[in-house]
Design a protein with these regions (language model features):
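Hydrophobic alpha-helical segments and their helix-loop junctions in multi-pass secondary transporters
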Residues: 32-70, 75-78, 82-94, 267-279, ...
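Extracellular/periplasmic helix-exit of transmembrane alpha-helices
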Residues: 96-97, 102-104, 134-165
Length: 312
């Protein structure tokens, strides 16, 4: 509890005084470091016959087989939080605004200069989306394969107070006695960066929600004040949940499950903006529209099935 309190207090200070660049640089360094260690671990694991992942096992994993029992619930929960989940899709525009991209594009008008700036910004978004997809797909595959190779074969189930220690077993075959230290660093990197960025993002969403619902005015100074207040209150709320709720993996699954339910709503919002709010000069091609509809359909399948399995 002492360490949790210390981390909370340090985070509050960093979040209150920090800006986009600090949050971006810290989180990028932490996550990239541990992801690289994990991929190196997976690579060297293939040299150990008892832990090597075969092509047959990969083919079985890619087969169209729906797991029974809690396996499907876990898969749907993971769908809601891995890669770019519901919360990231909601929070992404706030970081774009804080970075200043929208200010560079400027208010919409009929000039060809504005059209050129807007199209340039959309190209940046597309590159960002494609590069992000490549990065998080390979990173996610690395963690999935590592978990299947070690935890799946040994029957270890991370949960309760031993969750971090159990997950650390994935690094023992390659790193030996140093695995615990390496994973402690990695766990801190990933978990703290998630805590750090999520808190900063939720603070901005909550502060903006107060403006949307008319609780506060649209004044930028008032908005910034509320962002700082939420940067103080949210970490304290998280600390309280840690103190009184002793099953962290259940919170992770519950959050992922709710994220899977929110994804269809975001799909509808995307369709609304595409067909009701999009400037005709910036309309995407038919191929992009087809991709959008396929994505929305996939979000509805995942979200609908999540609701069905929970109710039935």
């Amino acid at each position: 509890m002492m360490w949790a309190t210390l981390v909370t207090l340090v985070s509050i200070v960093l979040l209150v005084v920090g800006r986009y660049r600090l949050i971006q640089n810290v989180s990028t360094f932490l996550v990239a470091s541990f992801t690289l260690v994990t991929l190196i671990n997976l690579f060297y694991l293939q040299a150990l016959p008892e832990w090597r992942i075969s092509w047959a096992e990969l083919a079985e994993g890619l087969s169209f087989h729906i797991p029974e029992g809690k396996g499907l619930y876990v898969a749907l929960a993971a769908f809601g939080i891995i890669g770019v989940g519901a919360t990231e899709l909601i929070q992404y525009p706030y970081w774009c605004l804080e970075k200043g991209y929208a200010k560079w594009t400027g208010p919409r008008d009929d000039s060809p200069e504005w059209e050129a700036r807007a199209k340039g910004w959309i190209r940046v978004l597309r590159w960002d989306a494609w590069c992000s997809m490549i990065v998080y797909t390979f990173a996610t595959l690395g963690f999935y394969l590592l978990g299947a190779a070690i935890l799946g074969r040994t029957g270890l189930n991370p949960g309760g107070d031993q969750m971090i220690r159990t997950l650390g077993q994935m690094y023992v075959p390659v790193f030996g006695e140093a695995a615990e230290i390496i994973f402690l660093f990695g766990a801190f990197a990933v978990l703290y960066s998630t805590f750090f960025v999520a808190t900063a993002s939720h603070a901005r969403v909550c502060a903006d929600a107060l403006r949307v619902f008319g609780v506060t005015s649209g004044d930028e100074k008032i908005y910034r004040w509320w962002v700082r207040m939420f940067c103080i209150c949210l970490p304290l709320l998280f600390l309280a949940s840690y103190a009184f709720f002793k099953a962290p993996e259940q919170l992770v699954f519950a959050g992922g499950f709710m994220g899977a339910l929110i994804l269809p709503m975001l799909g509808v919002a995307a369709l609304y903006f595409r067909y009701r709010c999009c400037d005709a000069r910036l309309a995407p091609s038919k191929l992009w529209d087809i991709g959008l509809w396929i994505s929305v359909a996939g979000l509805f399948v995942a979200g609908g099935y999540a609701i069905y399995t929970k109710i039935v």
